[in-house]
């Protein structure tokens, strides 16, 4: 089964200068890691830009717990060695059977998610929608096809939360396709 996990603003805000538009949001990250632990994926697929933007400690947490696949159309820095990941240069209409038969989690970025949705590979998703008192600025938005697909699908609320001053809130939903 292939499950996506990602956070997005209410208007598709997804990234800002290689980071999250809302900055660090511990309460949502706790819900994310809790759900990732429950899923206990055999495989993680992640875009190169998303992987490289992760803090070192988060990258280290991914290594060894799951087989790591990085979607990259260019070489990664030399310190990211092939012994810790398998590169994916293209997402097509079919995927290796083991990715579908085992628990596989897709973490983003926006382009990888679009490729996976366009080819019908995503079977479910844990989507955290982030609400902010301030307008969220973004230079990367999740494609409207994904937003529409999520809007029209069955959604079950899994977690809700807010930061200490309530300036950020989230709703994490399981979306089934």
From Swiss-Prot:
Q: Give the E.C. number(s).
A: 1.5.1.3
| Entry keyword annotation includes Oxidoreductase | yes
Q: What class of enzyme is it?
A: oxidoreductase
Query: Gene3D superfamilies given for it?
Result: Dihydrofolate Reductase, subunit A
- Which molecular-function annotation in GO is an example for this chain? dihydrofolate reductase activity
SUPFAM superfamilies referenced in this protein's UniProt entry, alphabetically: Dihydrofolate reductase-like
Q: Which reaction does it catalyse?
A: (6S)-5,6,7,8-tetrahydrofolate + NADP(+) = 7,8-dihydrofolate + NADPH + H(+)
Q: Which domain of life is it from?
A: Viruses
Q: One of this protein's GO BP terms?
A: DNA replication
What switches on its expression? Expressed in the early phase of the viral replicative cycle.
What are the alphabetically sorted keywords of the record?
DNA replication, NADP, Oxidoreductase, Viral DNA replication
Report the function annotation for this chain.
Provides the tetrahydrofolates necessary for the synthesis of nucleotides and amino acids. Bacteriophage T5 induces high levels of dihydrofolate reductase in the host cell, probably for the viral replication.
Q: What name does the UniProt record give this protein?
A: Dihydrofolate reductase
């Amino acid at each position: 089964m292939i499950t996506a996990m990602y956070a997005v603003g209410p208007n598709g805000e997804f990234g800002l200068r290689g980071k999250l538009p809302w900055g660090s949001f511990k309460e949502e990250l706790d819900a994310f890691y809790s759900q990732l632990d429950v899923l206990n994926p055999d495989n993680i697929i992640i875009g190169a830009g998303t992987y490289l933007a992760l803090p070192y400690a988060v990258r280290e947490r991914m290594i060894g717990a799951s087989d790591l696949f990085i979607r990259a159309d260019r070489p990664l820095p030399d310190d990211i060695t092939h012994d810790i990941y398998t590169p994916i240069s293209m997402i097509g209409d079919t995927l290796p059977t083991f990715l579908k038969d085992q628990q596989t989690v897709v973490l983003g970025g926006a382009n990888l998610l679009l490729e996976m949705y366009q080819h019908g590979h995503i079977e479910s998703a844990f989507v955290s929608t982030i609400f902010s008192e301030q307008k969220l600025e973004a230079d990367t938005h999740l494609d409207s096809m994904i937003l529409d697909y999520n809007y029209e699908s069955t959604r079950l609320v899994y977690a809700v939360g807010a930061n200490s001053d309530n300036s950020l809130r989230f709703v994490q939903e399981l979306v089934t396709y």
